[in-house]
């Protein structure tokens, strides 16, 4: 047996990602209550000490997982905003498009984000992270993004996304599409 096979080469970046993937898997599969440091270490195939090197407690792990999912969402929304040629209401439209995309509901990413979103009332750090993210977008947003209409459209998008994740699809595809189109049209300049 070579020395290489006897000792795993240390790669802290890879281990960090592996731990977050394991945490995401557990959160999406079993919920936030099942997300313990022992469970994540076991899922990742590392010692608890290896996990504690990166995440000193459960809150740090949950925050890192939420930040990772928020970064994925940020990338997708930024891509949608860049592709949108109409500047008026661009953020709200991208937010609506991202959360109302039917294919998002069926992803592990969406399930993980839902689990962490539902944990926000009990996790002030997550609430602050989400609030800061939203306020940063609104600070860069325009009149529509900061209006009652923009808020209504984003809250409706949240509702569509969350209801499909928690209740399944309760409206026909046609009804859903008409609802999303109505919301989309509310974001366009008149």
Placement of each model-derived feature along the sequence:
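Helix-turn-helix
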Residues: 18, 26-60, 64
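Short alpha-helical scaffolding segments that buttress acidic/His motifs in well-ordered protein cores
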Residues: 95-99, 112-117, 153-160
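Hydrophobic alpha-helical connector segments
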Residues: 64, 71-112
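Amphipathic alpha-helical segments that line or abut small-molecule/effector binding pockets
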Residues: 21, 85-104, 151, 176-188
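Hydrophobic/aromatic-rich alpha-helical bundle segments in the mid-to-C-terminal region
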Residues: 106-107, 124-190
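N-terminal intrinsically disordered/low-complexity leader segments
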Residues: 1-14
């Amino acid at each position: 047996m070579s020395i290489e096979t006897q000792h795993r080469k240390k790669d802290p970046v890879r281990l960090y990602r592996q731990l977050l993937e394991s945490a995401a898997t557990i959160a999406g599969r079993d919920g936030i209550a099942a997300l313990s440091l022992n469970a994540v270490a076991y899922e990742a195939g590392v010692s608890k000490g290896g996990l504690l090197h990166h995440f000193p407690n459960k809150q740090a792990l949950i925050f890192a997982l939420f930040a990772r999912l928020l970064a994925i969402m940020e990338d997708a929304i930024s891509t949608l905003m860049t592709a949108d040629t109409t500047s008026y209401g661009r953020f709200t439209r991208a937010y609506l498009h991202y959360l109302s995309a039917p294919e998002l509901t069926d992803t592990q990413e969406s399930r993980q984000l839902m689990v962490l979103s539902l944990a926000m009332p009990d996790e002030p750090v997550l609430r602050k992270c989400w609030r800061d993210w939203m306020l940063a977008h609104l600070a860069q947003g325009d009149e529509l993004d900061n209006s009652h209409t923009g808020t209504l459209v984003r809250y409706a998008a949240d509702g569509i996304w969350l209801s499909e994740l928690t209740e399944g699809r309760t409206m026909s595809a046609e009804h859903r599409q008409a609802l999303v189109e109505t919301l989309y049209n509310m974001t366009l300049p008149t």
